[in-house]
A protein has these predicted regions:
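Short amphipathic alpha-helices in soluble, non-transmembrane regions
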Residues: 55, 150-159, 233-238
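Active-site region of PLP-dependent enzymes
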Residues: 9-17, 22-138
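Hydrophobic residues in beta-strands of the RecA-like P-loop NTPase core, especially within AAA+ ATPase
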Residues: 3-4
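Alpha-helical initiation/capping and key positions within long helical/coiled-coil segments
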Residues: 105, 211, 229-232
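Conserved PLP-binding active-site segment of the aspartate aminotransferase-like
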Residues: 127-129, 136-146, 166-184, 214-229
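C-terminal/domain-terminus segments
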Residues: 221-245
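Conserved PLP cofactor-binding pocket of PLP-dependent enzymes
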Residues: 62-71, 112-117, 153-217
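Secondary-structure transition into beta-strands, especially the periplasmic turns and strand N-termini
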Residues: 49-50, 146-151
């Protein structure tokens, strides 16, 4: 089974095919910093009937959803309470109708900022494969080394440029900050198989990842910005980066 994590990739494509449709299952997130949101949660996409049925049952206590009487439904196995509410689902459907407009705004704002930062010596960007169209919810750029990147990140914050993230020292999205996972700090029991797999994290060489993440700053692309606001932000980022370098 190929489980495709496309949580931050909604709207991205490769050779005309949407990201999230390459795996047996594609996963999307709808939390508040994703391309569209319905409060929390996400969605799983699949063309496999068995996977679809299993996912539908598993997220609702294992109910088989046969018939109209919930009290008469069978439970083929244990599941969890991961159901989305009708209110959240309604918000999600409304967001889907706005998706094309949201993507256009993000692309516009992304390209304005990138076009300005491209003129700064020492700033580079990730490579998108030929035939690929990326998701524009974040602009990721690289600086020559980790020390300079931390300096620039601090300077951006001190100069009022919000929503710029340095994941390398952030406890949110990088393995160095995941002591709870590496040391299996949990309120419950875990299987020996899971414990053995997690233990490998403490023995894994992440030096290549460190070399990339330590030089990366990610800036959120908001859809509420006007063109003028984006231009002002871009020029401010440019000035701060040049000053820090």
């Amino acid at each position: 089974m190929l489980l495709e994590d496309a949580c931050q990739a909604l709207g991205g494509t490769y050779e005309g095919k949407p990201l999230g449709s390459y795996g047996d299952l594609g996963c999307f997130s709808f939390d508040f910093v994703k391309t569209i949101t319905c409060g929390e949660g996400g969605a799983v996409l699949t063309n496999n009937d068995k996977y679809a049925i299993n996912a539908d049952q598993y997220q609702d206590h294992g109910h088989d959803h046969i018939g109209n009487d919930r009290g008469e439904e069978a439970h083929l196995y244990m599941g969890y309470n991961f159901r989305i509410s009708e209110l959240n689902a309604a918000v999600g459907l409304a967001q889907l109708e706005k998706l094309d407009a949201i993507l256009q705004l993000q692309k516009r704002n992304y390209e304005i900022i990138r076009s300005v930062l491209e003129t700064v010596e020492g700033v580079t960007f990730r490579r998108v494969p030929e035939g690929g169209v990326e998701n524009y919810s974040f602009l990721n750029f690289f600086l020559p080394n980790g020390e300079l990147t931390q300096k620039v990140h601090k300077a951006l914050s001190e100069n009022g440029v919000d929503a710029c993230f340095y994941w390398y020292t952030n406890n949110w999205h990088y393995i160095d900050g995941w002591e709870h996972l590496r040391n299996l700090k949990t309120l419950g029991n875990v299987s020996s198989k899971f414990r053995n797999q997690i233990q490998k994290l403490n023995e894994t060489d992440f030096s290549k990842s460190d070399a990339v993440i330590s030089r990366t700053i990610s800036t959120l692309i908001k859809i509420g910005w006007t063109v003028e606001e984006v231009k002002v932000r871009a020029e401010k980022m440019k000035a701060v980066i040049i000053s820090a370098l």
